[in-house]
Amino acid sequence: KFMNALMDNREQMLNPTAFIQSTFNTVGAQLALLLKIHAYNVTYVHRGLSFESALIDGIMSIAEGKQHVLAGAMDEITPTSHIIQQRLGLMKGTTAGEGAQFFLLSAQKEEQTFAELKGVDTFITRMSVPEISNRMHHFLKSHRLAPEDIDWFISGKNGQKATDSVYTELEHSLFPHALHSSFKEQCGEYQTASSYALWMAAKALKEEASSRYAL
């Protein structure tokens, strides 16, 4: 609605209410009102890094002394956004998805705790497979782990050959011994789909006693 009004009015005399009350801007506020949470509340709209940004913020808050942090992500399919992504070729060969996942982060292990988040790393620059491999080695080493420690490698394969081939090469070169799976086969492709991957990993670690580390 806001974008249509932006075009119709040639970027002049716009009422910002529709933007202010848009889904992404109100979910965090509505949850806080419903749950009566009067604490730090922030929403990240960083496309594919939105959930990771929220997660890193939550980890930093825990490090600063907070005891509990609610972190999560949500996305929904709208006809307009779906058409635009199709025209740009972003959905070619993939299945569009949507979802919402939330996690309660705690400073200490509690009775309900069933997984530990060891760390999060992000990068947005284009890298070759060897560069990505080196970065993953460094990430694991920073947490006193090696590739052979990983029991389950969860990739973001979505049906696009160009990116799927990168995951396949990493599976063969770094984690040939691990269980391989693609979470987007279940949830589809959307900007915060990685939140589904984290839920999927945490749930599996809870149910499968034989698995210790998932990446």
Q: For each predicted feature, which ranges?
A:
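Condensing-enzyme catalytic core mediating Claisen C-C bond formation in acyl metabolism
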Residues: H82-W152, H177, L215
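Short, surface-exposed, charged loop/turn segments at secondary-structure junctions
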Residues: F2-L6, S81-K92, L170-E171
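Conserved catalytic cysteine-centered active-site region
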Residues: F2-I56, E111-Q112, S165-A197
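Acyl-CoA/ACP chain-elongation machinery
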Residues: A73-I84, K92, G119-V129, S155-S165, ...
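Conserved active-site "lid/cap" helical segment
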Residues: K1, I56-D57, M127-D151, A162-V166, ...
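Short beta-strand segments
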Residues: V45, V69-D75, L215
